Structure formats: structure tokens, C-alpha cells
């Protein structure tokens, strides 16, 4: 039998060059101690241990628990703000770039496609999409342009207004076609002209307005066509004319 001290005796210990795999005894049940590797054999390079510790800090619970310097957080915030202000201030839905950024790619789902955008841009895109999809949203009506009448049109309207303060539908159609205007233009002009006419009547000493509160004419306030023709005939007869006795006197003198 060979004794352990004799040369050539079998060795029952771990071979040389192999690490000692003895069980590591934990001093506590903390997560940090469980995740950290047991101390290496004596003589191991401290640089390798530091590198392994750095790798552990990048991933896992240790990275969350590790204290980071304050200036790194400021740098990250500044970088995110700079990325936000690089985008144009115009609404994203109105530009091709914004719609391309907010829409998902052909091989990429919607949420994953927009996850690379800053939070401000994502929220702005959602608000615009919600605002444009409202069913009750109405577009603002543009203000109508003021109609500019020609001199001939104004003369025709004034002449007709002197005779007829209110137009029926057939009369309005005939007047609009004769002057080259639309029915709405003739109707609007008549309404404005009647308002002016009422003011003139009241300022001229009239005690009452020639029309009712709703705008309809009162009885006997507007002359009929027969009355107008009689008034014209009376004006013609009132013109100075030669007396029948004058030519006979001249003949006598001759």
C-alpha cells in the first residue's frame, strides 16, 4: 500500500488548475448577495471581477438598485428635449412626415411602430386623430362677399322700387332676369332698401311706420298700380300749357 506522502500515491483532492467548487455560504438572504458571484480564488485579477460586476449592473435587479450619478439623468433629459424640438411645430396630421411617423410600417404593428417617438408627439397625434374623427364637428362657414351692383342695375332697382315696394315671386324672377341678377340678390337689396325707406318716412314727419312690425305693408300705405297711373296723369295735366284764347287774340291783331 502506498501512503499519501509517498511519491506516486493517488491524490483525492481537486486537480491543479481547477477552481474550488465548494458550496458558498451566504451570510444573509439579500437579493444582492444571491446575485453576486462568490469570490474567486486567490490571485485572480481584480480587473476581471470588476468587469463581471459591471456586466451585472447593466442587466437585472442590480441595475435598478444601483445608484447612478445625477448628471447622467440630466443628460438623458436634455437629449430627449432636443429630439422633441427637432420635429416641426405644425400639426402632425397635416404633414406627410407626421403621418408617416405615426402610422405603423408594413411589417410592424401600430404600437411598436410609434414606440420610438417621444411621448409628446405620440399624445399630440392621438389628440389630433380624436379631434378629426368627431361626427358633430362642423366647418366654419365663410362670410359672403358683398354684391357690387352696376349703375344700370341700381337704376333699374330704384325705378322698380318707386313703383312697387314689395315684390311677389314672379315679379322678383322677372326683375332678376332682366337685370342679370339672382333672386337672392334682388331680395336682399329690397330688404335693405325698405329699411332705408322706413327711416326716411319716420324722419320726414311720419308718425307711424308704413309697414307692420313683421315687415308687411299696412293698408293704403302703398299705392296700387291704378293709383300710380292716375298720379302720373295728374302730374302731366298740371304742367303749364298755352291758353286757348292767346292764338285768337293774335289773329285779331293781325
Swiss-Prot record:
Record SMART domains: HOX
Tissue expression from the record: Expressed predominantly in the facial primordia, developing stomach, and proximal limbs.
Keyword terms: DNA-binding, Homeobox, Nucleus, Transcription, Transcription regulation
Positions of the UniProt region annotated as Disordered: 1-20, 204-254
Subcellular location per the Swiss-Prot or TrEMBL entry: Nucleus
One term under GO cellular component: nucleus
Disulphide linkage map: none
Family (UniProt): Belongs to the BAR homeobox family.
Function (record text): Transcription factor, which is involved in craniofacial development, in odontogenesis and in stomach organogenesis. May have a role in the differentiation of molars from incisors. Plays a role in suppressing endodermal Wnt activity. Binds to a regulatory module of the NCAM promoter.
Protein name: Homeobox protein BarH-like 1
Species of origin: Mus musculus
Gene encoding the protein: Barx1
